[in-house]
């Protein structure tokens, strides 16, 4: 009996150690898979366009196209999760993307490291995050007037960062701290 308990204890301990060995470390730095240009074009730009579209078109008025499967729609507003929900989702994607903008190790398209440690970068990223969450709350409330205001705030946050870090005469100077 004693041997059985000892053997079972050993098996449980070994199994627990195997689980611990397979658990990803929380100390591992986030992996970067896209440069800044790819991140902007792939995530932030499309999501921002959904938020910006709510300035002129009420997402609640968007109609599904008869005969077209909303599961296959490439237009977020007419997809399965369309209308105001698409605007909510886009705003949340932008807010979460602010975290991606802060990850060290990401380069700009010209190979220059993104200036994640620059104080101005941190401010701009926080402005994007804040404006995105305001857009999310406006979309939840289905308040188009508030969407106009929050989209303008989001646009200003994006433009401020672009003026400082992107809009340079020579593309090789993008992301360089001046």
Predicted regions located by residue number:
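Positively charged n-region of N-terminal signal peptides that target proteins for export
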Residues: 1-4
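Bacterial N-terminal signal peptides
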Residues: 7-18
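Mature extracytoplasmic or organellar-lumen-exposed domains after removal of signal/transit peptides
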Residues: 23-178
